[in-house]
């Protein structure tokens, strides 16, 4: 069995439906332990590798791992937080250095959740214009957008620029509390943007008995890729097995899972910073 591969929207890239998130192995104490997680993911067939400049040691450790593997079949995605000008250029240059790459497949303008940040990245010296310079130079292949907290603002941003991909919280917890799917996905699909799901396991708060169901939920339509943070080779193996044997949830399974997710949120919401205080999903 192999992890299914899917077309990542207009990028034309075929990537595995399961991606390796870049936060969790960043938190491990030893570099080698983090590298082993990345290596196991690659060896088990995962091709989409996620990181970000703001994830502390994540980019550097991914760079270490990539030195020991053939990266020609891998898709490397990072994120930038600076909004404009020389600060952003330095952030991007630092990402190249830490990853030790000549070309980055996807760089995502990270955490666009407010009107002010929208204006900043669209400005003449804003993030998108800077990234376009790198694209013209052949250093960055694709540009994406991420957002965590304001679906309506994110939907507006999708219509303001021709992004290649979007990255949103699309797990069960978000579906029942602050749904990104309804306002954003049709817009993204109409523009042939690749759709990437994050917060799949609700920052590790998914009950152990429901973890495989949470992943199956995120692997189903509409996402092309579901990225999951993993900090051990055992977690890699567990998630790969689910992806290799992926079967969409039945209507009953999904209904019952969402009911349990809704009951879970009040117990864990204080640890899930991206969720609003009050429920917004219907």
Language-model region placement:
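Short catalytic-loop micro-motif centered on adjacent basic/acidic residues
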Residues: 47-53, 77-78, 141-145, 167-168, ...
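Glycine/proline-rich, positively charged
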Residues: 29, 43, 83-172, 176-183, ...
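Conserved, mostly hydrophobic/aromatic
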Residues: 8, 20, 49, 62, ...
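Alpha-helix-loop-beta-strand connector modules within alpha/beta enzyme cores
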Residues: 59-78, 127-138, 188-192
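Structured C-terminal cap/extension of enzyme domains
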Residues: 40-42, 46-47, 179-282
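N-terminal binding-site loop/beta-alpha segment at the start of enzyme catalytic domains
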Residues: 1-74
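Generic structural signal for well-ordered alpha-helices
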Residues: 5, 38, 59, 63, ...
